[in-house]
């Protein structure tokens, strides 16, 4: 998946109010960018970190720049949570996710459950597969952890997926790891113990838990391979 062109190299000054971040461009200009990530971004928002921004000149945009990538622990990390759904869809369509082949159509953002929208609904003549996509950026030691902040929304999604299984459909919680380090994915129990409990409950009740790594670079982001999940 190609990132917006061109990207602008920048240095992070600070992130604040969740959706705002200040950067210094190579020219020395200081700009405020939209931060498309509602999590804590633990380990990914250290002042002085190299970053890449995209730019939109649409007149309705209040902030022209969007934060796309940050460099931490020696690797580029994709922090834009608006991209993983498209990334996973492209990977499925290109045959890169063996577990999700054989479906005739893929529909994005379909309403289901209690006022929820599933990220991807895979359909064929005799089966529906509900896929919830989660962007993962936190690494501690060898573990890639989710979530990086308590998430009642994520908890709700797991309950909704269990409901889908009870209705006789297939349900998948799909972790996308947008960084090169870390050896396995695990729930961040110290950050959100209820999410960890629900993830284990979901797995025990038929929800499939998948994790794939993405190669992240200014040239683009692509799914590269499967990671193990440790409960």
UniProtKB/Swiss-Prot annotation:
Superkingdom of source: Bacteria
Q: Which GO terms describe its molecular function?
A: DNA binding
Q: Where are the transmembrane segments?
A: none
Q: Which Pfam families match?
A: SfsA, SfsA_N
Spell out the InterPro entries in the cross-references.
Answer: SfsA, SfsA_C, SfsA_N
Family of this protein: Belongs to the SfsA family.
Instruction: Quote the protein name from its UniProt record.
Output: Sugar fermentation stimulation protein homolog
